[in-house]
Each structure stands twice: as structure tokens, then as C-alpha cells.
Amino acid sequence: MSLGTEEYTWFNILLESMGAKKGAEFMQALAKQDLQMPGSSSVMRVQLMLAGESAIAIAARGRRVTEYKQQGAPIDFRILDPYAGEPNFVALLQRAPHPHSALLFIDWILSEEGQTRLADAAGRIPVRKGIKQKPWVQELFQKDFVFLSPSSIGPNLNSLIEQYNQIFAVRKTK
């Protein structure tokens, strides 16, 4: 089994859904399962799995797995509970050098055209309802996502990273 070295969103959602104590116990038991932690890239872990380096890629990005599956790779996935969705954010800096241009971009990226472009060109899962998605992405909608609340991770990010690194023996280089 492989797990990324920076799966903090997945880690936080499981701790929240299972409760801190039970979640930590689960993670400690998982860490004892001879995990491979080749790096932070989900794509790389899925590619290593396809090359036979591991049988399971935990917390792999579903859109990448479905993309490889659609291309004929011998791969499949299971959606477990909770099904963690990792939103992409768009923000405007308080002192942006060109705030009006930034607002126009935000309006566009959230528009039907912008969300369609994200779905088509980047293979992203749009947040806007009614956007036609690539057929192979439809499998990811078998269950509802549980999204990470930025307010739950933001203030606790450093301690969450420390706990993750300690449980999974992740060594960070400075």
C-alpha cells in the first residue's frame, strides 16, 4: 500500500469523522501496515501502483484514477466513507495590483464557460451544477463528498502536519 507524504486533507477529514482518539488509533494501525510513502504526488503513486510497486494507493485522486481507467489501464477504485473532496480555491488578495482584472477572472472562472473549460481542459470536477463532465468522471459521483472546512484545518495546520508526520514517520528535509 502507498500513501502520500502530505495527505493532510484526507487525514483531517478522517480524524474529524472518526473522532480524534479513534481516528488517531486507526492511523497508527494503518502506519504499521508496511506502507510505502514515495512522495506527495498522487499521480506518481498511481503510476507506481500501475507499474506493480504497490497494490493499493490510499487517498489517490479519483479523477486521475478514472482517467487511467478510461485509457485502458488495469485499475479500479473504491469510494470509502467518508468520501473526501478537496476543493480548489480562488481568492483575491487584499492589495492586488489589478483587483478589477482579478474580479473579472473570478467571475469568469465561476461562470458556466469557465467551469466548462476547467472540466474539459483540466479534467477538474466543476462546482457549478449543470456542467457537462467527461463521462469517465461520472463514476466519482456515486457518493456525496465531505469537504474539508478551511476553518477546521487552518488554525490547526501545524499540529495536524506534526501529528501526520509523527504517526507515519515522515521525515521532512529543510
Language-model segments: which ranges?
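Short amphipathic alpha-helical coupling segments at ligand-binding clamshell hinges
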Residues: K22-F26, P97-I109, R117-D120
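Ligand-binding pocket segment of bilobal, Venus flytrap-like solute-binding proteins
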Residues: S2-R78
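Solvent-exposed, polar/charged alpha-helical surfaces in well-ordered, non-transmembrane soluble domains
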Residues: Q28, Q47, A51, T66, ...
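A bilobed periplasmic-binding-protein/Venus flytrap-type ligand-binding module shared by bacterial periplasmic
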Residues: L15-E16, P87-S101, R117-L118
